[in-house]
């Protein structure tokens, strides 16, 4: 029970940073804050037994640090997706559920530089469904609640974009 509380408390810090990121304007500030978010979310996953989620968050930190310095190219995206798969391959003890963070990170990494607001929101929705399933499996209730809120805000955003185009 103590690890459940500790893991969820650590994840809460990451979730609060995620909310703060919504107020940041500069890409560099967002990437740095996302590194802090991923550190807390990753440690929360690790405490709760979610090893592949931890690895995905660590690779996301590395990806963000590299993208702060270098241009985001398809070769770099493919490299990070492959790194994600290679590092996670030994941590798939929970079966298909272990693949969800890996697939979510791969999808987001590939689509993160899209110019289409609609496409990005749909990608975020898809990845959040994967993370929600994973977080519920590992009893990360705090992250699950924020996953749902992220999905709702993106659905509202999609609705607003569609009304603007109509």
Please describe what each predicted stretch is.
Residues 1-166:
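Alpha-helical membrane-protein topology signature
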């Amino acid at each position: 029970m103590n690890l459940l509380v500790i893991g969820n408390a650590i994840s809460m810090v990451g979730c609060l940073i995620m909310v703060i990121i919504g107020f940041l304007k500069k890409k560099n500030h967002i990437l740095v804050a996302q590194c802090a978010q991923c550190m807390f979310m990753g440690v929360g996953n690790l405490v709760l037994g979610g090893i592949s989620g931890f690895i995905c968050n660590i690779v996301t930190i590395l990806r963000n640090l590299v993208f702060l310095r270098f241009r985001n190219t398809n070769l770099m995206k493919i490299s990070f997706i492959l790194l994600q798969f290679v590092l996670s391959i030994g941590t798939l003890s929970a079966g298909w559920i272990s693949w969800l963070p890996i697939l979510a990170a791969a999808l987001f990494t590939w689509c993160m530089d899209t110019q289409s607001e609609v496409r990005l929101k749909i990608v975020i929705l898809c990845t959040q469904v994967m993370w929600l399933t994973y977080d519920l499996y590992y009893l990360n209730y705090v992250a699950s609640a924020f996953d749902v809120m992220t999905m709702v805000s993106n659905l509202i955003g999609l609705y607003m974009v569609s009304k603007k185009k109509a």
